[in-house]
A protein has these predicted regions:
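Acidic, His/Gly-enriched loop-helix segments that form or flank divalent-metal centers
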Residues: 107-229, 233-238
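Extended recognition/assembly regions associated with phosphoester-bond processing machinery
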Residues: 1-8, 16, 20, 29, ...
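Divalent metal-coordination and catalytic microenvironments
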Residues: 9, 40, 66-67, 97, ...
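Short, glycine/acidic-enriched loop or turn micro-motifs at the edges of active sites
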Residues: 11-12, 43, 69-70, 152, ...
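Residue-level marker for buried hydrophobic side chains located in beta-strands
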Residues: 6, 35-37, 63-64, 146, ...
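N-terminal active-site segment of His-dependent metallophosphoesterases
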Residues: 1-53, 58
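Active-site neighborhood of divalent metal-dependent phosphoester bond hydrolases
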Residues: 48-137
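Long, low-complexity intrinsically disordered regions enriched in small/polar
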Residues: 263-308
Length: 313
């Protein structure tokens, strides 16, 4: 039995995610605790790099692709010449993501050439980011749950729709999947919008039966039959909804190998009771050890990332 901590649409709000995971009882040292992101981890918020560092450090984490992951993927793969890259920079918060990963303080008036230079720098400094994005699954299942960014088509399930539907659909976000006994958990469409559409269509809405933390108002998770919508509207609420789900995996996960981490690259700071992760660009986030309350300098830091804490002086 694993305990899954499920969230969606963080959009660079790292501190909101960290607060919610702490409140939900997430322990990164517990092999039975698994993070499940339903996508849209990046854009709009200012701390996309920290969100990536948290998610990519542990191969046990489940990171489902959302439409905003495709925005970053296109930018890294095709550069500023990508079909929608410039549009997403101007209108969908991709500029803030590039700024976060490139350690740059950019303005809206930045030149195209400068943006391309920053994209090139990200590909060089974070060379595992693009492969990580490209390998993201469109969905994840446990014994009793199905997780996806935007959802599935209730009229054809268990046949799965195409990728565009699973990344973008809002038409069926409020419709239960009557052909399945599983519970379907989705993001993408703000939870309060899903609730409005469901009630207008005559469905009964409730709060999820599982434990959850996050928004206590209309932006909190909403349950319609066997579907739970959890998009927290994070950039406005500065909160992230986290469901805590105990369930059996579909298959036995692969055993982790223990490799000695690389030497010493660890800087953790606590400013105004905010906790941040700062990792040198040369370190692959997959090699980072991530623990709670193990900072040598300040025990009040909730999350700490380091490569080899014994070598810190």
């Amino acid at each position: 039995m694993n305990r899954y901590f499920v969230f969606s649409d963080v959009h660079g709000e790292y501190y909101a995610l960290a607060d919610a995971l702490r409140e939900a009882g997430y322990d990164p040292n517990n092999p039975k605790h698994v993070l499940v992101s339903l996508g849209d981890n990046f854009d709009r918020g200012t701390n996309s790099l920290d969100v990536y560092t948290l998610l990519a450090h542990n191969k046990q984490n489940i990171c489902i692709k959302g439409n905003h992951e495709t925005f970053l993927e296109e930018a890294l793969e095709k550069g500023i010449d990508g079909e929608f890259v410039f549009f997403n920079i101007l209108h969908n918060g991709l500029l803030e993501t590039i700024q976060s990963f490139a350690y740059a303080n950019m303005k809206k008036t930045i030149s195209v050439a400068q943006i391309q230079a920053y994209i090139n720098a990200i590909n060089e400094s974070w060379n595992q980011l693009l492969p990580w994005l490209k390998k993201m699954p469109l969905y994840f299942e446990t014994k009793n749950y199905f997780f996806c960014h935007a959802g599935v088509n209730p009229n054809i399930y268990p046949t799965l729709p195409d990728e565009h539907f699973m990344l973008w659909d809002i038409e069926y976000s409020h419709v239960p999947i009557h052909s399945s006994n599983k519970t379907f958990v989705i993001g993408h469409h703000h939870a309060f919008r899903v609730k409005e559409k469901a009630e207008q269509a005559g469905y009964t809405t409730t709060k999820p039966k599982v434990h959850w933390v996050g928004n206590e108002d209309e932006n909190g998770p909403v349950m319609i039959g066997n579907k739970i919508a959890i998009d927290p509207c994070s950039n406005l609420t500065h909160k992230v909804n986290v469901l805590v789900i105990d369930d059996e995996p579909l298959e036995e996960p692969p055993k982790e190998t223990t490799e000695k981490p690389q030497d010493k690259v660890y800087i953790s700071s606590n400013q105004d009771n905010k906790y941040t992760i700062n990792v040198a660009r040369s370190i692959d986030p997959n090699d980072i050890t991530f623990e709670i309350n193990r900072d040598l300098y300040n025990p009040n830091i909730t999350f700490g990332a380091y490569v080899n804490h014994e070598n810190i002086r």
